[in-house]
């Protein structure tokens, strides 16, 4: 079991291309496909103003970005050792180890999708997979690309299975 905690301080979630009620399932599929089952992830849905403020305060960078990733650990965490299979194990009231926190700007997501000529939902899944890869300890490169592809494909499978 995995858990996603969603915060929407800017009331921007309505602009997501994936319904808020479906985001947890998307993350669960991504985590299962990439060996990160059994962790909690925090997701903050932001606008450009909020993500720009966090970007400057936390990273010293000026301006908005698409997604920020804040791993809970200095190194990739160990998988919870008990041989759990995806979708089994702890119930919703059990404490799970925190993998990390993500901040997604809906404004930048939509702007980039338009500029890149991509479907907004596809770009959203790509950004969420990218952020998940960073909090799992991956940096840019071939391993990150493989991680992102596995996560994105799993998320797409859950979206088309409905």
From Swiss-Prot:
EC number, as in UniProt: 3.1.-.-
Swiss-Prot/TrEMBL keywords: Cytoplasm, Endonuclease, Hydrolase, Metal-binding, Nuclease, Ribosome biogenesis, rRNA processing, Zinc
GO biological process: rRNA processing
GO CC annotations, alphabetized: cytoplasm
HAMAP family named among the record's database cross-references: Endoribonucl_YbeY (MF_00009)
Gene name linked to the record: ybeY
Swiss-Prot/TrEMBL cofactor(s): Zn(2+)
Transmembrane segments: none
Compartment list: Cytoplasm
Domain of life per record: Bacteria
SUPFAM superfamilies: Metalloproteases ('zincins'), catalytic domain
NCBIfam families linked to this entry: rRNA maturation RNase YbeY (TIGR00043)
Protein name: Endoribonuclease YbeY
Residues given in the record as Zn(2+) binding sites: 130, 134, 140
């Amino acid at each position: 079991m995995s858990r996603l905690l969603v915060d929407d301080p800017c009331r921007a979630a309505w602009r997501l291309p994936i319904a808020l009620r479906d985001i947890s399932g998307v993350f669960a599929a991504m985590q299962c496909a990439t060996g990160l089952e059994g962790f909690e992830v925090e997701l903050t849905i932001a606008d450009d103003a909020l993500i720009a403020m966090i970007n400057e305060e936390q990273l010293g960078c000026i301006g908005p970005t698409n997604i920020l990733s804040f791993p809970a650990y200095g190194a990739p965490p160990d998988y919870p050792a008990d041989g759990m299979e995806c979708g089994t194990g702890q119930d919703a009231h059990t404490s799970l180890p925190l993998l990390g926190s993500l901040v997604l700007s809906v404004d930048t997501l939509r702007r980039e999708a338009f500029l890149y000529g991509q479907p907004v939902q596809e770009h959203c899944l790509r950004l969420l997979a990218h952020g998940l890869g960073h909090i799992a300890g991956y940096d840019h490169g071939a391993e990150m690309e493989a991680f992102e592809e596995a996560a994105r494909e799993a998320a797409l499978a859950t979206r088309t299975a409905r």
